[in-house]
Amino acid sequence: MQILFNELSLSGQFSDQVDFVKNGLLSFIGVLREMQGFSALLLKRSDVWKYKITPTKTLHSFLINNEFRKFDEVRRLKSAIVGLTKEPFWDFDSKQDLKSTYFFDENDIRGSSPAEASERDKVVVSFVSSPTSLDPLNIIRNDVTIPLLNLTRSGKLTEFLWSNNEISFESYLKVRYSGGKLDFSKLDEKISFSSIQSSEQFVFIDTFRKFEELTWSQIHTDKGLDYKEYHGSIGITYRDIKTYKFRVSQKFRCHGFREKNSFIVIGFETDHKLSNRG
């Protein structure tokens, strides 16, 4: 998938560089990291460095500014976006038709990344708080509205790919819940995704969303989840670990263990055989 960086979303909207880092850059980098998980290709204009992050400062001036050199976090953030000023650049091979017109909000945007995206995969990534931060971002091409998926926060791309059947159930869960209360990175292959049918996936997703939204005290007392210690044996790997299970449906269970503020998912139970043993 080709995703274009929307340079029009840098319109000098941030009051200063601190505001840019706090209210613009953090969420933007979250989207970039999500894109990396799906090997998406980020394309941009070759002159993106000249667009303004504040009324007086450009992206280029921010990247070369040593004002924040003492702050490791800001240096890491800068490193994450320095690629915006490097190849690949789409304007070396533009797909825009010379005979076509491209407008946004009655403004001619020919030559911009949103215009280019309307001729490619129709996905852009943008900074927040600009006139072109809307989602969908509607481009009028030859008097026809072309809605672009506008990625302004992490999670949007994952949901889009999942709803369009472009990623597996496993990929969806691992990315969707990365860094949250549920962790799917240590699944036991013997009781993992192969036991779940396509028609059953949304039951699991609904329960996982609920689990993610509740506090741990609510999880422990929620009658629907019925979260409790599992007293049977899942396998020799987990014999020294206190494992737990919670209810996905009357028939389905999810097994795992608590590690700090996360529930590390070991696997899924769709036939009640494990629960019959503990």
Residue ranges and their predicted role:
Residues 252-265:
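Active-site beta-strand-loop-beta-strand hairpin of nuclease catalytic cores
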